[in-house]
Amino acid sequence: MENMAEEELLPLEKEEVEVAQVQVPTPARDSAGVPAPAPDSALDSAPTPASAPAPAPALAQAPALSPSLASAPEEAKSKRHISIQRQLADLEKLAFVTEGNFDSASSLNSDNLDAGNRQACPLCPKEKFRACNSHKLRRHLQNLHWKVSVEFEGYRMCICHLPCRPVKPNIIGEQITSKMGAHYHCIICSATITRRTDMLGHVRRHMNKGETKSSYVAASTAKPPKEILKEADTDVQVCPNYSIPQKTDSYFNPKMKLNRLLIFCTLAALAEERKPLECLDAFGATGIMGLQWAKHLGNAVRVTINDLNENSVTLIQENCHLNKLKVMVDSKEKEKSDDIFEEGEKNLGNIKVTKMDANVLMHLRSFDFIHLDPFGTSVNYLDSAFRNIRNLGIVSVTSTDISSLYAKAQHVARRHYGCNIVRTEYYKELAARIVVAAVARAAARCNKGIEVLFAVALEHFVLVVVRVLRGPTSADETAKKIQYLIHCQWCEERIFQKDGNMVEENPYRQLPCNCHGSMPGKTAIELGPLWSSSLFNTGFLKRMLFESLHHGLDDIQTLIKTLIFESECTPQSQFSIHAPSNLNKQEENGVFIKTTDDTTTDNYIAQGKRKSNEVITNLGKKQKTDVSTEHPPFYYNIHRHSIKGMNMPKLKKFLCYLSQAGFRVSRTHFDPMGVRTDAPLMQFKSILLKYSTPTYTGGQSESHVQSASEDTVTERVEMSVNDKAEASGCRRW
């Protein structure tokens, strides 16, 4: 059967030899030792003598090449990888072709192949497979490359061990050499895939889509159009796969819209204090955030958008022209920027676009407002941000490394933030306090203190906005607010550790619960260090709400209202939202800030160092007297502490019950079912138990059920007061 297959195959090969008489130039050898791809014509034009060894049986059954793949002009111009061949003999010829000896490759037969010198495998590096005799090389190619190949339209995609994957620069710009083992090269899209099963599925997906070599090359040569998205009356061009950071240089996440709106309201509120403001978007990507600042705030801000990637800088400049904003490069207006605007169009402002490392830029220039939004953690840029930030300026930090902050990768949190955390019911506020603590330590190293304006932790990011207070006194006061937290793993009660350097004999006494006395073993752990002071500034949040109403940002108003309720720790029914009545004079923790239009940056700086020190001193005194008015730290999840067999009251009613009991209470944006209150966990559970109803009535009348439930509630409340461990509610975390 093999001889018959060989006889049927030889006429076909002779026809191919007669047709493909094309002279192929000798390719230059790669300096790295990696063989260059061999043209189709060079391999197909070699004659196959009758004495040559018969190919594998699978080759005789290989189907003919499809017309779309054989007659495509794009394939004639392009070169496929050397691991993609028609026959096993073509792989053997590559040992001579890669050495540049095309004459010997064209006249290759079994005699001179066996009598040849030692040859190396064309698909393996020299350190993996050394040069050997022809019979060993033939056996190596057949067993380790040809038998595990993937067939597609008459071609065999053999396994390759060469370092074919291109290296990519990292964030700093250094080349990263990634180790790569055996892999396949797709004949259609030239992708590199490591496993054979994955390669089969990859080719199958191409076939299901009807893609061939010619159609894929034609589609890839056409430049994909850029999509234009609109957000807050700002148009931005985005690249294909803009929402996948691994597949694009300019990442744009539509889910971060709330983050961008919060930062815009922050800058708008700061612009009422003094103008113009020097603003920096350190990681521009598409430039959407800086474009919103310049387009809506106008001459009140001087925006600088920075990015290290050259493609992102080009995209930012295109988006500036798309929004009728002139681009400034190196303090000079970009050439040909006037030609972009048509007659009658108005220039809405200027934006400076820079291409440098964010740390270098923040060391070179001083700013009033800095926003950091790197891909991942932001701890590598905090020292540079506080180095040249102006007094009473604002630094906003967006952290997207939620796997470490939300206690999914605790070792990463210990490495980046130097703190110990576990997964708790209040893990989102714990993440916000971790970031604030890192920001406070970075500011203290630069002899600066901070005042937290607000902190937001949602599903995709953690946003922290702080005001900078210059001076060692403010730095010392800020450093004192970084403390450790004692957390009970049974009932999840928590309390910040007392100040002092003396070692306490029994730290369990600080916890309000008695789980250590009623439960075996060690019940509490130490978390932190964390920020222990307030996370919100009510006055600044009200000004942000006013700016959101002024600019018509309806999507963010609900969140800002929730932050205001949370900062004052009051139910929503006891608070009314209204615009500030006197915008010329507002107080924030003892600091009176003028917000008239006449205030400029020069007048603000000219007030002198002594005057600013007096303002900071008054701020410290006011903060000491207002410690009791701060919102209570952390919150309780009402579902986490529910009683089995009991129906909980509605959340709004439960807030009223806690308020009637004399406790401060409010909802929290960290958890939709969370309750922020200064009530201890034992009182929280007793009130929750008091107003819960049994789930099963048993067919009794309503009056009997009500009296029985009241007796049951009374007994359970007495039991909860006497036994603080409360076996029904205590669960191991």
From Swiss-Prot:
S-adenosyl-L-methionine binds at residues 260, 307, 357-358. The modification Phosphoserine is found at residues 66, 612, 707. Its EC number is 2.1.1.-. CDD domains: AdoMet_MTases (cd02440). It is an enzyme of class 2 (transferase). GO terms for biological process: tRNA N2-guanine methylation. Residues 1-78 are annotated as: Disordered. A motif (Nucleolar localization signal) lies at residues 135-139. Keywords: Isopeptide bond, Metal-binding, Methyltransferase, Nucleus, Phosphoprotein, RNA-binding, S-adenosyl-L-methionine, Transferase, tRNA processing, tRNA-binding, Ubl conjugation, Zinc, Zinc-finger. Zn(2+) binds at residues 488, 491, 513, 515. It comes from the Eukaryota. Residues 39-49, 57-73 have a biased composition (Low complexity). Residues 227-688 form the Trm1 methyltransferase domain. InterPro entries: SAM-dependent_MTases_sf (IPR029063), Trm1 (IPR002905), tRNA_met_Trm1_C (IPR042296), Znf_C2H2_type (IPR013087). Residues 1-18 have a biased composition (Acidic residues). It is found in: Nucleus, Nucleolus. It holds the Pfam family TRM. Belongs to the class I-like SAM-binding methyltransferase superfamily. Trm1 family. PANTHER family: N 2 ,N 2 -DIMETHYLGUANOSINE TRNA METHYLTRANSFERASE, TRMT1-LIKE PROTEIN. Specifically dimethylates a single guanine residue at position 27 of tRNA(Tyr) using S-adenosyl-L-methionine as donor of the methyl groups. Dimethylation at position 27 of tRNA(Tyr) is required for efficient translation of tyrosine codons. Also required to maintain 3-(3-amino-3-carboxypropyl)uridine (acp3U) in the D-loop of several cytoplasmic tRNAs. This is tRNA (guanine(27)-N(2))-dimethyltransferase. It comes from Pongo abelii (Sumatran orangutan).
